[in-house]
Design a protein with these regions (language model features):
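Conserved NAD(P)H cofactor-binding loop of Rossmann-fold oxidoreductase domains
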Residues: 4-9
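Substrate-binding pocket helix/loop in short-chain dehydrogenase/reductase
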Residues: 12-13, 20-22
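Active-site loop immediately N-terminal to the catalytic Tyr-X3-Lys motif
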Residues: 14, 61-68
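Active-site helix of classical SDR
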Residues: 36, 72
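Residue(s) in the substrate-gating loop at a strand-loop-helix junction
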Residues: 56
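Active-site-adjacent segment of SDR/Rossmann-fold oxidoreductases
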Residues: 61, 82-92
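SDR active-site lid
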Residues: 89-160
Length: 200
């Protein structure tokens, strides 16, 4: 099973609505869950199966103007990592596939939703982010055909990874995020330990 349905709702969070958020999750999260729920009994009966859930680098790092999309992909990651533990005993492998920028129509106006700026305080940021994101359309470094071949290889693997980053740009972004997390973890170790109770 390859869960690949999704779209990006772009826009600064304060300029999005509750309906926008629910629509984003309906496609990117709940649709994926519904299909997975329907397929799992068949895989469980066969004691084998592969589930590849398409996330994104946006499922590990937040990006301004993509809060709803990032939130939906964080949900895909959390769901997938949890599901993997539940179904492993039945020979079912779950892999989170996290592509970087792949040369698709994702940044084409037909594929995303991007409301006009409505709050003057955000106007400059909105303009700058549009100028950064939108010109990348059809100039993304990742090759969708090569991604497809890699997914076939993952599906055929005897021991597929729990999480796989697709594209060197994805690997670089994950490396950067891991370094940030490690630095924050180290800086806050003493405060973190201060929460431990002295129960003995």
């Amino acid at each position: 099973l390859v869960n690949n349905a999704g779209y990006g709702h772009l826009g600064l969070f304060e300029q999005t609505s509750d309906a926008d958020a629910r629509a984003q999750f309906e496609t990117n999260v709940f649709g994926m869950m519904d299909v997975t729920r329907a397929v799992l009994p068949v895989m469980r009966a066969r004691r084998s199966g592969r589930v590849l859930n398409l996330s994104s680098v946006a499922g590990m790092a937040g990006f301004a103007m993509a809060g709803l999309y990032c939130a939906s992909k964080f949900a895909v990651e959390g769901f997938s990592l949890s599901l993997a533990q539940e179904v492993k005993a039945f020979g079912i492998h779950v892999t989170v596939v996290a592509p970087g920028f792949i040369r698709t129509d994702f940044l084409d106006p037909s594929s995303y939703r991007l409301p006009d700026a409505s709050i003057p305080d955000y106007a400059a940021m909105d303009e700058a982010l549009r100028a950064a994101y939108l010109p990348m359309n059809h100039l993304q470094p990742g090759d969708p055909a090569r991604l497809g071949r890699a997914l076939v290889e993952l599906a055929a693997s005897e021991s597929p990874p729990l999480r796989w980053s697709a594209g060197s740009d994805a690997v670089q972004m994950v490396d950067a995020r891991l370094a940030e997390l490690k630095a924050e973890l180290d800086a806050g170790r003493a405060l973190s330990a201060s929460v431990d109770g002295e129960w003995a």
